[in-house]
Amino acid sequence: LPDLLGRLVQLEADVLYQEPPGEGEHRIGSLRGTTPVLLSAAHGAVHTRRGEPKQEEEFTAAMACLVAELTDAHALYARRRSPTDPNWYRDVPYKRRLSRIVA
């Protein structure tokens, strides 16, 4: 169990909740697996709904990644602040990326 908790903390260190992506960085992260399951953590970083920031759901990105690593599933997660809310708006980068993974 301590190894899993340590790995969870390592994975969450990649998520900068409040920060927009820097030059050359992606606001969305993903892991590819072979198991036909996709784990999604769309609110892993601060996101914006109707012009207002909404707090991140801490450690959801890391949990999605950890479970993906353990099961060889796919994972898609927010890793930097987003000007959109992928669970609220239809045509946003997160959903476009999700569509490419499941296609």
Label the model's feature ranges.
Residues 1-103:
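N-terminal catalytic or cofactor-binding beta/alpha core of small enzyme domains
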